[in-house]
Amino acid sequence: MLLWPLRGWAARALRCFGPGSRGSPASGPGPRRVQRRAWPPDKEQEKEKKSVICVEGNIASGKTTCLEFFSNATDVEVLTEPVSKWRNVRGHNPLGLMYHDASRWGLTLQTYVQLTMLDRHTRPQVSSVRLMERSIHSARYIFVENLYRSGKMPEVDYVVLSEWFDWILRNMDVSVDLIVYLRTNPETCYQRLKKRCREEEKVIPLEYLEAIHHLHEEWLIKGSLFPMAAPVLVIEADHHMERMLELFEQNRDRILTPENRKHCP
């Protein structure tokens, strides 16, 4: 029932100004460079005073630990992934369904992920620094891409999601000022994942984590195929908790101070 009103709204949006409008030809699958709209001067000035930082990384790479570390910093707001929403959409659990049958439920989950992450990006920012767990960019470049490459998402589903993502980039402000990449060995993630024992994650194999790691490397290290959403600060995150907290402290200024972010490699 949830999809019917969305379909009607989507059809109207597409006719008016959505993907493929103005006679632009449809292109093949795959990420594309997207021309973003120019934002009003007052919005640009407001953005100059505020920063959005996304913490990216594999499943169980330490993102929650990173967010918790900086959550007590002055004038920092933290937005976690809306996992609780993905687990319960009017009584349904699309996250759990996707992990058990990605071919059937991949599009369902990723459509909702894109919507909820868009909500995260566009909600009013009350602090100077917003720290987000992942982003709408990694939803597209990592998780949608993995479903498609692994053969679990048909090309038509992939193209439709990509068209919506490109439209969002052109028409909505989902910009990011810095990406903190917690670079973690897939085997380390797998061991951590087994220890925390979340219900939906019990079926995740090591091969899945390896595929997700490979896509993060393509996007954030090699800079190949995918557009870079922001400068990237890489933190090696295979270490134990105490060492990770030390690394977060060492990188505090590079993460929270705008002038220092410009010098991130």
UniProtKB/Swiss-Prot annotation:
Free-text tissue specificity from the UniProt record: Predominantly expressed in liver, pancreas, muscle, and brain.
Annotated phenotype, changing residue 139 to V: In MTDPS2; severe form of combined brain and muscular atrophy; depletion of mtDNA in skeletal muscle; normal residual mtDNA in blood and fibroblasts
Top-level taxon: Eukaryota
Active site: 133 (proton acceptor)
Protein location: Mitochondrion
A biological process from GO: deoxycytidine metabolic process
Impact noted for substituting residue 121 to N: In MTDPS2; reduction of activity in muscles
Any one GO molecular function term: ATP binding
Catalytic activity, EC: 2.7.1.21, 2.7.1.74, 2.7.1.-
Transit sequence range: 1-33
Reactions that this protein is recorded to catalyse: thymidine + ATP = dTMP + ADP + H(+); 2'-deoxycytidine + ATP = dCMP + ADP + H(+); 2'-deoxyuridine + ATP = dUMP + ADP + H(+)
Biased composition (Low complexity): 20-32
Keywords: ATP-binding, Disease variant, DNA synthesis, Kinase, Mitochondrion, Nucleotide-binding, Primary mitochondrial disease, Progressive external ophthalmoplegia, Transferase, Transit peptide
Enzyme class per UniProt: transferase
One GO CC annotation: mitochondrion
Disordered: annotated span: 20-47
Transferase recorded as keyword: yes
Binding-site residues, ATP: 57-65
Similarity section: Belongs to the DCK/DGK family.
Pathology noted in the entry: Mitochondrial DNA depletion syndrome 2: A disorder due to mitochondrial dysfunction characterized by childhood onset of muscle weakness associated with depletion of mtDNA in skeletal muscle. There is wide clinical variability; some patients have onset in infancy and show a rapidly progressive course with early death due to respiratory failure, whereas others have later onset of a slowly progressive myopathy. Progressive external ophthalmoplegia with mitochondrial DNA deletions, autosomal recessive 3: A form of progressive external ophthalmoplegia, a mitochondrial myopathy characterized by progressive paralysis of the levator palpebrae, orbicularis oculi, and extraocular muscles. PEOB3 patients manifest adult-onset progressive external ophthalmoplegia and progressive proximal muscle weakness associated with muscle atrophy.
Annotated function: Phosphorylates thymidine, deoxycytidine, and deoxyuridine in the mitochondrial matrix. In non-replicating cells, where cytosolic dNTP synthesis is down-regulated, mtDNA synthesis depends solely on TK2 and DGUOK. Widely used as target of antiviral and chemotherapeutic agents.
Subunit text: Monomer.
Protein name per UniProt: Thymidine kinase 2, mitochondrial
